[in-house]
């Protein structure tokens, strides 16, 4: 947007002005303060995700973690445990069911439970591990993302990622920012210190 507005002003600007504008455009996203208000807690035992805002649980969502179990080894297709953070968010304003390949939209849009299809859809929340037990998470492309296989939400069915219904992942995506804390545990949410009873969205 900065570059577009500069073009509209004409081409008579100084070289220093253009250079400064280019640097600002390049690095402005990285200057955004990390989200310290939100905390995502995922229970592989319950197949549920709790969203915490400033210490208060504001909602829970059903999810689907790996059908291959837990772990962080390369090529294992398992869901890692432990402390992570939201590294990147991909899919702003993409329509519900928009298909992604290599984190880019293909132009295809799928309806929920489209037969024979299992791509990443709607939104991508890319996770980065913060501990030794999940240090490969970012390189393994571990995401929270939408799935067309909504019939399998609530049971382990993924290849390592955390799957959500498209409507739910849009809701989550619009609330949490980069840097938000993410914790994946192999215990019931009831055993995790989340305080007040959550309001269930579905």
Describe each region flagged by the PLM.
Residues 1-12:
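N-terminal secretory signal peptides that target proteins for export/translocation
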Residues 29-30:
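C-terminal motif of bacterial Sec signal peptides marking the signal peptidase cleavage site
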Residues 35, 73-77, 94-202:
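Exported/periplasmic cell-wall-interacting domains
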Residues 37-59:
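Post-signal peptide N-terminal segment of mature Sec-exported envelope proteins
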Residues 39, 60-62, 83, 141, ...:
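Well-ordered beta-strand positions in beta-sheet-rich domains
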Residues 46-48, 83, 124:
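Structural motif
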Residues 62-94:
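Electropositive
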């Amino acid at each position: 947007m900065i570059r577009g507005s500069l073009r509209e002003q004409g081409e008579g600007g100084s070289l220093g002005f253009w250079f400064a504008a280019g640097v600002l455009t390049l690095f402005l996203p990285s200057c955004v303060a990390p989200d310290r208000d939100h905390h995502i807690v995922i229970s592989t035992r319950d197949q549920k995700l709790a969203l915490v805002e400033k210490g208060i649980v504001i909602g829970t969502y059903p999810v689907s973690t790996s059908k291959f179990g837990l772990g962080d080894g390369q090529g294992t297709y398992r869901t890692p445990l432990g402390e992570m953070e939201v590294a990147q968010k991909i899919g702003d304003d993409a329509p519900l069911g928009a298909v992604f390949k290599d984190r880019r939209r293909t132009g295809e849009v799928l309806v929920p439970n489209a037969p024979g299809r299992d791509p990443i859809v709607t939104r991508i929340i890319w996770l980065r591990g913060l501990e030794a037990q999940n240090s490969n998470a970012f390189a393994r492309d571990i995401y929270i993302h939408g799935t067309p296989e909504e019939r399998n939400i609530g049971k382990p069915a993924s290849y390592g990622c955390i799957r959500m219904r498209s409507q739910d992942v849009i809701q989550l995506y619009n609330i949490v920012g980069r840097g938000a804390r993410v914790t994946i545990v192999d215990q019931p949410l009831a055993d995790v210190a989340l305080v007040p009873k959550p309001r269930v969205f579905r």
